[in-house]
């Protein structure tokens, strides 16, 4: 229990929701294309989908997360969009020590699966951040606006030059689920780049093949990916994170496992509804 107290009172707990969002960060990166809005074939998700996850540290449940694709289409920049919201929060006794209640959302182009706008509402103990990111894919610009918590007015926006079809976490999540891994070989390396928290990243991801994985939501055949982690103060080594996606047409994140400097943590799928395709559950 002392290790749990240390974990929830640390800066790592303040960022625990990152474990839920990490599969989306992997997906945010893709090779560049020439078209402004290249069509991405999507047979993996639809409006009305709902995914629920639990976050744990060792044997202790510390939080839950949800991913929701809204029932109605939205419109932005005269383009039809999915509206997607991701929520992550601590639960139970952990709330008393380190209350986390985060919301991440985006308007995602239904044809190209790129974001037109994304937003974050971060509530982690006393720390608060409200941010809006606007994507202009025609001009290749990203505009970031952060709310001043005292005046409740947005600060001076910051504008970045962007590569074609740049994605955020949510847009990356949608894009990843359309990827075909059937022709990948074990230990293939995918070199990817994208935009997250005011920075552009390049990251290597290893494809480790397929295996059976059991989570609360059921037993699945899964695609296994391992990002090569850059040096940081949270995850223990470059091979510290593993991600499992369902090996079916839905390609939903099933599980994330992370070795941290102060213990092991993870995320797993607990329930789902509104999937576009029947899930391939194993007996």
Task: For each feature predicted by the language model, list its residue ranges.
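N-terminal secretory signal peptides that target proteins for export/translocation
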Residues: 1-13
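General helical structural elements
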Residues: 9, 18-19, 124
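Bacterial N-terminal signal peptides
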Residues: 18-27
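Acidic, serine/threonine-rich low-complexity disordered tracts
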Residues: 31-137, 178-283
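Active-site/ligand-binding surface loops and adjacent short beta/alpha elements
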Residues: 138-196
């Amino acid at each position: 229990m002392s290790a749990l107290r240390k974990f929830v009172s640390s800066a790592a707990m303040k960022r625990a929701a990152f474990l839920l969002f990490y599969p989306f960060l992997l997906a945010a990166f893709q090779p560049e294309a020439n078209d402004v809005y290249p069509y991405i074939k999507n047979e993996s998700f639809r409006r009305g989908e709902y995914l629920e996850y639990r976050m744990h540290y060792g044997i202790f449940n510390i939080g839950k997360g949800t991913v929701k694709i809204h029932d109605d289409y939205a419109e932005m920049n005269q383009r039809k969009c999915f509206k997607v919201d991701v929520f992550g929060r601590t639960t139970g006794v952990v709330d008393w020590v380190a209350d986390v209640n985060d919301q991440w959302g985006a308007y995602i182009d239904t044809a190209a699966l790129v974001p037109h706008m994304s937003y974050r509402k971060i509530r982690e103990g006393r720390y608060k951040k409200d941010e809006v990111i606007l994507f202009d894919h025609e001009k290749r610009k990203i505009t970031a606006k952060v709310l001043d918590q005292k005046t409740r007015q947005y600060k001076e926006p910051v504008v970045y030059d962007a590569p074609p079809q740049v994605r955020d976490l949510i847009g990356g999540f949608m894009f990843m689920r359309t990827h075909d891994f059937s022709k990948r070989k074990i230990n293939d390396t995918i070199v990817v780049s994208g935009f997250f928290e005011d920075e552009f990243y390049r990251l290597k991801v290893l494809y480790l093949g397929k295996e059976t994985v059991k989570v609360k939501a059921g037993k699945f055949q899964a695609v296994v990916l391992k990002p090569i982690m850059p040096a940081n103060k949270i995850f223990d080594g470059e091979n510290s994170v593993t991600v499992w996606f369902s090996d079916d047409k839905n390609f939903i994140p099933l599980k994330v496992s992370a070795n941290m400097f102060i213990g092991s943590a993870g995320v797993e799928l607990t329930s789902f509804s509104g999937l576009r395709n029947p899930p391939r559950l194993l007996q």
